[in-house]
């Protein structure tokens, strides 16, 4: 059938819609500078950081962003857009990774730790990381929001023209201008103990660097300092605070018995520090020699040599807090902590890289560097002579020296602990542990099994022995795992949250390991002639709230406690229990002096009657008449005479201590220098192998 003729449309033509206005292609260069400012702001707000330093990290972010923004301008529009999306995703991944590291491990990690991270097994932290991912999902979405919007909308709203060449020059100039403006603000007259200018010239205090300078600048400075280490800015005003006359400053140590004549000569060695300073190979060695030469040594006392010739077993207990000790649930820990030396003001502050640098304090008597390289690992990499470590001191005295850890080679311990002087055994190098069908460690390893599978190495030795255990059962996360299972009925009856119940089970496992150890020593007839030393490496920082339940106290808001924000928490969260015990002790010895992990090595060296030089350690013999001091990672500190808050720059005298304002100002100024010196000396000792200059390895 023929269709009827249809006439063409004779009505009004409808004009097509005008093209959507698009932004010039060169405006894409603004994205990365603004993204970095956004990411820094989200990171700071999420971490509860002070925003007063926003101008600094905003300017440095704009500078770095302008430089990266060149990748958005130099090529064709499609390549520019894809490169920008890729860089946006990578930068966001970097920020979220650092955010999660701070949330779970209480530390930001610079790029120089990548080698360590690659060598470690993140499976140890997988449960905590997955939990943190889930708990912070809304924040992670906020981090990634700009990248998602860019990927979806950039092509739609940008022209397809090639950006003019002069736009690249504009952003390159912007990078320089913003960087110079950032430096100007950094060197403005900021107040405080750690100013932006001081942090900018330093490779330590990473958390403060992130807060004041920004994450991007911390990472940039880290890369710079890998090739150009910062020069020391320490002065040589080595005056020490005067000897206190206040109660408690001498330690308030109650003697076991009165000794008619006590040798109170200084614990020093016959070394020529002045001569070393004069002939030093560099400024750092000269500074160290002069500093140690000016330091007042601690004196021998009525406890010197109390355990001379004893076997020595030292334990660093993973994630341990004395708030968990209970006479019924942990009877062995209770017995040892109440029947030996009883330390009422002992602290285990959380320093950089937690366990590794908890060991640094305990084994070296030195505060760890608050940054990279990781101190304990570095000693193994360099082969630094740890002359005063118990392993070396007792090894020179003819002891059998062994060390054990129920894990893989984390933080390079096979090298570092062998270098300390231990015959080191861990999984894969001589220590047998339960494994899975695939041959991996049945995680976590049981502390009781580590004791059971190692004790025969030394228990029947004809020579004295020194054994070091780094335990593992208390490793986070605190969930119903193979460590908790044997104690499940007991802990589920406790009036705590499930996390706290599970944490208690890990402490019970450490308690049973100690019980087994004492039983083995007693059966071998070695118990009365053995000194037991035990401390935590750090508190359970991933779940510090459990300590509020166990102690019945409040240490800060939930957010501040979760982040261990030292500007807002009660430092008693770090209060802990130090065990120094022998079955030969007739009665306990109460010690009220302020002390911490670095004090263990000199205290034990004196108790064993070893020859050591007390000037060359950051710790002090707790049982001597020296003033007690505990330094926290933020550089706040507590001494026998009071507490100094670095954030408020205020000093609160201890109970019973009276000072005029002038005396207080002089004391605080002097102590702040001592704190700086004790923190700064460690990397110089390690990097220059300082002890080896005085005591060359044979």
PLM region descriptions:
Residues 2-268:
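Transmembrane and membrane-interface helices of multi-pass
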Residues 92, 196-200, 271-274, 513, ...:
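Alpha-helical scaffold segments in carbohydrate-active enzymes
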Residues 235, 257-294:
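Helix-hairpin-helix/helix-loop-helix acidic hairpins
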Residues 278-698:
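Solvent-exposed soluble domains appended to multi-pass membrane proteins
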């Amino acid at each position: 059938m023929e269709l009827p003729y249809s006439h063409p449309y004779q009505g009004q033509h409808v004009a097509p819609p005008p093209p959507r206005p698009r932004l010039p292609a060169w405006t894409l260069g603004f994205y990365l500078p603004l993204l970095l400012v956004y990411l820094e702001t989200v990171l700071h707000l999420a971490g509860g950081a002070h925003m007063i330093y926003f101008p600094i990290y905003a300017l440095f972010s704009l500078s770095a962003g302008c430089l990266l923004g060149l990748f958005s301008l130099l090529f064709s529009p499609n390549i520019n857009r894809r490169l920008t999306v890729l860089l946006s995703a990578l930068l966001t991944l970097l920020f979220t990774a650092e955010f999660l590291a701070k949330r779970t491990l209480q530390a930001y990690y610079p790029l120089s730790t990548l080698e360590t991270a690659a060598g470690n097994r993140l499976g140890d932290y997988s449960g905590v990381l997955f939990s943190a991912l889930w708990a912070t999902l809304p924040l992670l979405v906020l981090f990634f929001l700009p990248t998602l919007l860019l990927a979806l909308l950039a092509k739609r709203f940008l022209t397809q023209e090639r950006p003019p060449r002069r736009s690249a020059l504009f952003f390159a100039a912007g990078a320089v201008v913003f960087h110079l403006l950032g430096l100007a603000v950094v060197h403005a007259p900021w107040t405080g103990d750690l100013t932006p200018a001081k942090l900018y010239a330093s490779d330590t205090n990473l958390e403060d660097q992130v807060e004041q300078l920004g994450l991007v600048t911390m990472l940039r400075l880290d890369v710079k300092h890998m090739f150009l280490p910062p020069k020391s800015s320490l002065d040589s005003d080595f005056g020490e605070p005067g000897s206190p006359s206040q109660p408690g400053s001498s330690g308030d140590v109650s003697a076991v018995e009165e000794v008619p004549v006590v040798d109170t000569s200084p614990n020093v060695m016959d070394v020529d520090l002045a001569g070393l300073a004069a002939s030093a190979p560099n400024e750092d060695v000269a500074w160290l020699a002069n500093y140690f030469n000016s330091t007042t040594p601690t004196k021998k006392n009525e406890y010197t040599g109390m355990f001379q010739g004893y076997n020595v077993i030292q334990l660093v207990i993973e994630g341990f807090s004395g708030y968990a000790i209970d006479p019924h649930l942990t009877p062995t820990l209770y017995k040892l902590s109440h029947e030996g030396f009883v330390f009422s003001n002992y602290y285990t502050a959380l320093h950089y890289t937690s366990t590794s640098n908890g060991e640094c304090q305990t084994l070296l008597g030195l505060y760890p560097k608050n940054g990279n390289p990781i101190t304990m690992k570095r000693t193994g990499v360099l082969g630094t002579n740890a002359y005063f470590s118990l392993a070396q001191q007792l090894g020179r005295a003819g002891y059998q020296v062994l060390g054990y850890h129920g894990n893989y080679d984390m933080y390079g311990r096979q090298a570092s602990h062998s270098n300390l002087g231990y015959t080191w055994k861990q999984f894969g190098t001589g220590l047998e542990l339960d494994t899975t069908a695939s041959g991996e460690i049945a995680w976590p390893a049981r502390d009781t099994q580590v004791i059971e599978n190692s004790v025969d190495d030394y228990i029947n030795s004809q020579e004295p022995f020194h054994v070091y255990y780094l335990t593992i059962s208390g490793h986070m996360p605190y969930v119903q795992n193979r460590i908790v299972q044997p104690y499940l009925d007991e802990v589920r009856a406790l009036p705590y949250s499930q996390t706290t119940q599970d944490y208690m089970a890990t402490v019970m496992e450490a308690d049973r390991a100690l019980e087994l150890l004492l039983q083995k020593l007693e059966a071998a007839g070695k118990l009365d002639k053995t000194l037991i030393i035990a401390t935590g490496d750090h508190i359970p920082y991933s779940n510090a709230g459990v300590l509020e339940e166990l102690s019945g106290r409040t240490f800060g808001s939930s957010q501040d406690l979760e982040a261990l924000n030292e500007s807002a928490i009660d430092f008693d969260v770090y209060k802990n229990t130090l065990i120094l015990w022998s079955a030969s002790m007739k009665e306990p010895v109460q010690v009220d002096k302020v002390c911490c992990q670095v004090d263990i090595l000199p205290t034990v060296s004196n108790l064993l009657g070893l020859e050591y030089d007390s000037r060359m350690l950051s710790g002090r013999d707790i049982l001597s008449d020296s003033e007690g001091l505990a330094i926290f990672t933020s550089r706040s500190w507590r001494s026998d005479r009071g507490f100094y808050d670095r954030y408020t720059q205020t000093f609160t005298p201890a109970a019973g201590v009276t000072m005029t304002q002038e005396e207080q100002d002089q004391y605080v100024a002097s102590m702040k220098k001592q704190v700086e010196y004790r923190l700064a000396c460690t990397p110089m000792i390690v990097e220059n192998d300082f002890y080896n200059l005085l005591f060359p390895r044979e």
